[in-house]
């Protein structure tokens, strides 16, 4: 923490000091829930199922189990900030769909960095009367134990009800065989069938489709050009998207709310269902029984009142994300608190936080070529000049010589006539491109060729965004034991939980070679659409910026042989009633967006729960 050997903090990280959070990591001394006359509104003495986290995976568990008759409570550290529909996508507003670049600020405002190395910059211009630290500060996300050379510097979390689904891209591709974990051993056909069954159901929950942008001029412009350039070599299609087109100018993007309406139940629409959502509640630990065979309760901290309670349930499901699932487990006595010590492995879940993966990411932006833009109006018959009295734009509907369908030509004609001041023939409200060539063994990376909002890549107002195409290629990373996520026994995060720390490097060999090949592929492909936008030349982005962290609590068939934490039903090994959901379960090297796969695993997990746990009887009394 300090660079000076004379400073009292110089050897702090090697000291025997343990933070208050670390000292309480296995504490079980919380008071019981308050009685029915004093309980938090909606909070019951005992639930059938408790779910931690309200993102799409938590909502998958909620939907499956609430509809099956279970009494379910869901706790989330974040608050409701998405409007009338709890956990809805914030891009579902006309303002952002008219100007996607404005949504970048929404994303940036939602993301909280996981681990930030301390800033070693010394401010030596302070007044002599001002207090000056002799060591580095530990607030504002700073982590003195984070090696900046082994960090996932772009890794961040979203703490709101609905999680990252309130601002995600909604890309929901299926994994192919190379990316998927096995669910059925020694029978590839049966495994394929099982994944197809689960994927189909997950897609129905998310409303995944591949035709929402079929009548976008820009989309077809990019799609057709790439299909022509790579004919016989690569297949191009729309990105599979969790979204529903409501009109030619408005798309409803799916989110946690799409999967499950987070309104409390019973209610008018669901009089026979039982569900309660508790926002702004930090879940601090699960309490194990004396034989380490099941979980007895969950300790929660109401962040508004400051009160702490113990929640009882038959089943406990953690879906708080790849970082916070592991954090909660470590704070409960699983894995190892503090810097990993290979000579002293933990007894419970020794692989927790090991073999983590995160995708490499290359990015650039191009400005569409003159050739492409001119081709937009290739079927138009233009007379005169814009603004002239005799100016007209027409086309011949249904003509065999037309290069574009009538819907395309009608849009172009109307725009060129109604907006003669616009030098571009593309309508102002033309939907953005959403193109991909999917992950394949010959090019093992996922591609998103589109125009969307991320925490980076906003376009200057001096450039018309209709001309811009974003290129994001995602590479897979081989799981390696030395790549770890661990939690400090000395430093705590903003919520007084053990501070997450990364020990990660992209592995040499296949992972690194594929990343270079992916960069070359993006450069060559993007040049076929146009020239690079100044300031957005091809580049590798910060590790972790993809936000697809995986493998923190890996899935497998055997805990020891597969170095994993949960089985294929997402149940923690050795515990009959503790389940983990999310991308942290995925143990493989994957390049595609993992959310649909994580949801599929959650559906399978729910099937196990329904087969092994019985819902409590429903009563007519208010629950």
UniProtKB/Swiss-Prot annotation:
Keyword Signal found: yes
Cofactor(s) named in the record: FAD
Cofactor binding, per record: Binds 1 FAD covalently per subunit.
Chain segments annotated as coiled-coil in the UniProt record: none
GO MF entries: flavin adenine dinucleotide binding; pyranose oxidase activity
Catalytic activity: D-glucose + O2 = 2-dehydro-D-glucose + H2O2
Propeptide: 28-38
Annotated compartments: Periplasm
Sequence positions that bind substrate: 448, 450
Keywords annotated in UniProt: FAD, Flavoprotein, Oxidoreductase, Periplasm, Signal
Temperature-dependence annotation: Optimum temperature is about 50 degrees Celsius. Active from 30 to 65 degrees Celsius. Thermostable for 30 minutes up to 55 degrees Celsius.
Cellular component terms (Gene Ontology): periplasmic space
Protein function: Catalyzes the oxidation of various aldopyranoses and disaccharides on carbon-2 to the corresponding 2-keto sugars concomitant with the reduction of O(2) to H(2)O(2). Plays an important role in lignin degradation of wood rot fungi by supplying the essential cosubstrate H(2)O(2) for the ligninolytic peroxidases, lignin peroxidase and manganese-dependent peroxidase. The preferred substrate is D-glucose which is converted to 2-dehydro-D-glucose.
Assembly information from the UniProt record: Homotetramer.
Name of this protein: Pyranose 2-oxidase
Organism of origin: Trametes versicolor
Name of the gene encoding the protein in the UniProt record: P2OX
